[in-house]
Amino acid sequence: MPSLLTHSILSVAFAVGLAAPVAAEKLKVVTTFTVLADMARNVAGDAAEVVSVTKPGAEIHGYQPTPRDIVRASDADLILWNGMNLELWFEQFLGNLRDLPSATLTDGIEPISIVEGSYQGLPNPHAWMGLDNALIYIGNIADAMAAHDPDNAVTYRENAEAYKTQMRETIEPLRAALSELPEDKRWLVTCEGAFSYLAKDLGLKELYLWPMNADQVGTPQQVRKVIDGVRDNDIKAVFCESTVSDAPAKQVARETGAAYGGVLYVDSLSTADGPVPTYLELLTVTSETIVNALTKDE
């Protein structure tokens, strides 16, 4: 027969169990690609869970979502996407989900227009590559999270301000290094025209093989145009981004005598053990690669 002490212990345990607070579920956020996911994690801190639809290294423009992507996203409280025609697959993807709230992170950004190809006249979607724009992204992320999780609104806004400070401290030394380069050397030659915002921020003129990865890429006409541009302007280095073939850029380098300056990162982060596992490292590695190639032998 149970003792009085046993009854007392069980009664206390039951009462404590009833009184114990139930941990609130964290806000679940899904982003369309890894760059946005890293930004969102910096804003979220420990207050929200953030995942990306695409994996590190993925080409974002023509991505084809899988049924698994849809299942994972269906559990989200909030979806963050870029807009500006970057995720051409997103509207159909969102249509496969229940009525999920989403936020377009380029809201409030002044776009740079694409000037050639099938997407001529449309906004260049790679707005996160500009410093001032990146600050707008961070603010939009904090606003969206705060709206859907007001209990943690202060946390999101404080984290966002701290992250903005880190970003300014990252980019300013790189901008200063490029400011020493003579005007006629300030060219950025790439495969995709994905660096218009960064080029504007760093005071560089831009030349590229194709305007968007979703367009035709690496055609003989595109290669010839850039070869002529490199020769006419005595450009010293050409680059290519990580998610496409560098063969056309290396052909330009061979035929002009320009150096192949290396890989630039824009559409995707790397895995944790790679060169750009975070957005700040993406900015740093990409900008340093440009600076090092253009200032070599100066």
Task: List each model region and its residues.
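Extracytoplasmic metal-acquisition and chelation regions
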Residues: 24-298
